[in-house]
Amino acid sequence: MSRRKRTRHWLRGHRRDPYVQSAKRAGFRSRAAYKLQQIDARDGIFAPGQTIVDLGAAPGGWSQVAAARVAPGGRVLALDKLPMESLPGVEFIQGDLLSRQFCEALREALGGARADVVMSDMAPNISGIRDADQARALALALHALSFAETVLGSPGIFLVKAFQGADMDELVSRLQQKFDQVDFRKPGASRDKSGEVYLLARGYGV
């Protein structure tokens, strides 16, 4: 199947996806909002008054869920190198996660406070070459973890997307060194054919 045909096939399936249709009706920016809702319903990640950092936030589905969960009194800082339209209760900072200036901008926005939750739904551009895609996904997740360590308070929570494969062992090992508990989550809203899972790490610095 040619790339053009694969794209058309994916678009047809995407439009028919019940989570895509439901997200449009509910006003969510993306179907990914339901993944976070389902993880939070199971694990109770959020609470009113928390400070949340959302890495790779655009178009904003996860930030929408977090903003609703931490109100009243909470903060959601959404970060992405892509532009994102404003959302109620969400502060957006545009920049590259690997840039020192970007990290300084976030710390300034936090004003000396620490984040209660850092979450990342970032994924690389998929090439279709399994090993290469897994390696890029791992690199993104490790960057997100390194960044989280600079802003998380204790006992903080880190939620990150990963892709199943041998390389994931390195990420799990790093998380287990830094957090008290690490769990795998595959929310119902994740597509069946997708190799994505989420790693939920709790108890940072405990």
Model-assigned labels for residue ranges:
Residues L79-S127:
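S-adenosyl-L-methionine
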Residues I126-A137:
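Glycine/threonine-rich flexible loop motifs
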Residues P59-P72:
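Conserved SAM-binding loop of SAM-dependent methyltransferases across substrates and taxa
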Residues P48-A58:
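Conserved class I S-adenosyl-L-methionine
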Residues A67, L138-S154:
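A short glycine-rich, Lys/Arg-flanked "PGG" loop and its adjoining helix->strand segment in the class I
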Residues G165-V206:
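Class I S-adenosyl-L-methionine
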Residues P72-G74, V151-I157:
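Short glycine-dipeptide loop
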Residues M1-P48:
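Class I SAM-dependent methyltransferase Rossmann-like catalytic core
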